[in-house]
């Protein structure tokens, strides 16, 4: 891969960095003030104002790669996007990761990005006009309902939500949780994964359907806190689906029994987008740590001069650089060979990025002493948010298993040779 940014990439990085300096960073205290006033689950005016500015600046729908322009169902839908490659998008997502809520300003936040790609690749023209267009215009938001509290959802074949055919409708029954974004008053639609045929082959039982959030039987049971943070105004919910009826023609994505296929196509880009933003969050934590250490004295000298902190700072810089390069490699592989071929790189970065950032944020918390565990410096909330990414879109253990099995597959001949020798000795 070429480490030199393309002219377009350089231009967008400069433009986005300038937008952050001029608009995002000054808006942080305004965002916090508006968030603290009154109802928690509400639209924040500062975000809506910034969306208009971002759209006018051409910093809109940056996430949608050219590969998303090869839909399996409909290829007539037109949308506004610069159509960046994953590699071109990577440094932009990293910048967005510096302020946790900023990706929404550019219409690049999860779970909407993944849902928009699903609609583009697998939706009918009618589904796109009804849901994708307002999503890409930033008029509504969405949710993805997959994880369930009653089963180990890291194995998607365990999903128990039932999607039963009843004439021209589906009737949906199930319980989901960690349904991100449901608390947002703009959340109008969800993509739900469940089973349409429990007797089919294991990976052909699941389907994905589109469900309006105002459909009768969609019940938000509770909002789930993350280490005490409610993540308002978007949040994560437990949702019960009780006899929810949706028309088959309007709801079904791609076809019955193809939900697992859609999920695999959706989660690859989503995973790497998270990892790109994580690098930005880690950079902020390192900056805060260095600034704190350079201004505090203990035992007669600045804390930054203590050898233990020099080691931690050096390790943080090395780990950030390594993770950034692995991000770029995964993005480049996705662009050149496709998500399936880039499976190893995606799995590696999904394990590496959150663990890297959590270590740096934890060191930054330590550098701030008691203040680090308060909300005064933003480190505790950053830690809480990134800790969820060791679970979201597949836990570390699942991705590590993928890496290990692909590594061990290189030694299949050796294993066969050993078994043959053992069999020979037995004879």
Residues covered by each model-derived region:
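Long, acidic (Asp/Glu-rich), low-complexity accessory segments flanking structured domains
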Residues: 243-261
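Flexible, small-/acidic-enriched active-site or ligand-binding loops
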Residues: 158, 214-245
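Short Gly/Pro-enriched turn/cap motifs at secondary-structure boundaries
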Residues: 150-154, 181-185, 198-200, 227-235
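A short, Trp-centered hydrophobic/proline-enriched beta-strand micro-motif
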Residues: 138-147, 192
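Short, surface-exposed charged micro-motifs
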Residues: 160-162
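N-terminal glycine-rich flavin-associated loop
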Residues: 104-126, 155
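Alpha-helical interface subdomain recognition
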Residues: 1-100, 109, 122-127, 134-139, ...
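A short core secondary-structure module
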Residues: 168-169, 173-221
């Amino acid at each position: 891969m070429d480490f030199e940014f393309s002219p377009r990439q350089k231009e967008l990085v400069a433009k986005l960095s300038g937008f952050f300096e001029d608009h995002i960073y000054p808006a942080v205290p305004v965002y916090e003030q508006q968030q603290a006033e009154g109802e928690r689950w509400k639209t924040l005016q500062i975000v809506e104002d910034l969306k208009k500015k971002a759209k006018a600046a051409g910093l809109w729908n940056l996430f949608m790669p050219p590969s998303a322009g090869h839909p399996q169902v409909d290829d007539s839908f037109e949308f506004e996007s610069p159509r960046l490659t994953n590699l071109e998008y990577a440094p932009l997502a990293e910048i967005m990761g510096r302020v946790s809520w900023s990706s929404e300003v550019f219409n690049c936040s999860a779970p909407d990005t993944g849902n928009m790609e699903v609609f583009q690749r697998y939706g009918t023209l009618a589904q796109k006009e009804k849901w994708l267009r307002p999503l890409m215009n930033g008029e509504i938001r969405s949710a993805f309902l997959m994880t369930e509290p009653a089963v180990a959802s890291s194995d998607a074949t365990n999903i128990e939500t039932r999607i039963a055919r009843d004439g021209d409708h589906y009737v949906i029954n199930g319980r989901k949780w960690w349904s991100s974004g449901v608390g947002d008053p703009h959340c109008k639609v969800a993509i739900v994964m469940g089973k349409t045929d429990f007797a089919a082959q294991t990976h052909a039982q699941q389907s994905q359907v589109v469900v309006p959030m105002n459909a009768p039987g969609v019940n938000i049971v509770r909002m789930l806190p993350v280490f005490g943070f409610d993540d308002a105004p978007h949040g994560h919910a437990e949702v019960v689906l009780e006899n929810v009826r949706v028309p088959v023609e309007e709801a079904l994505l791609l076809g019955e029994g193809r939900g697992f296929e859609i999920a695999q196509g959706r989660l690859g880009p989503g995973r790497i987008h998270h990892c790109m933003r994580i690098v930005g969050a880690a950079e902020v934590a390192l900056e805060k740590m260095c600034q704190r250490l350079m201004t505090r004295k203990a035992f007669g000298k600045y804390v930054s001069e203590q050898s233990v902190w020099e080691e931690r700072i050096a390790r943080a810089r090395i780990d950030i650089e390594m993770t950034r390069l692995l991000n770029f490699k995964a993005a480049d592989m996705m662009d050149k060979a496709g998500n399936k071929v880039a499976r190893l790189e995606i799995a590696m970065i999904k394990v590496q990025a959150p663990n890297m950032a959590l270590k740096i944020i934890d060191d930054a918390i330590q550098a701030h002493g008691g203040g680090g565990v308060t909300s005064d410096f933003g480190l505790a909330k950053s830690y809480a948010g990134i800790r969820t990414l060791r679970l979201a879109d597949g836990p570390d253990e699942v991705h590590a298993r993928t890496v290990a099995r692909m590594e061990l597959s290189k030694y299949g001949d050796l294993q066969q040779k050993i078994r043959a020798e053992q069999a020979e000795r037995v004879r």
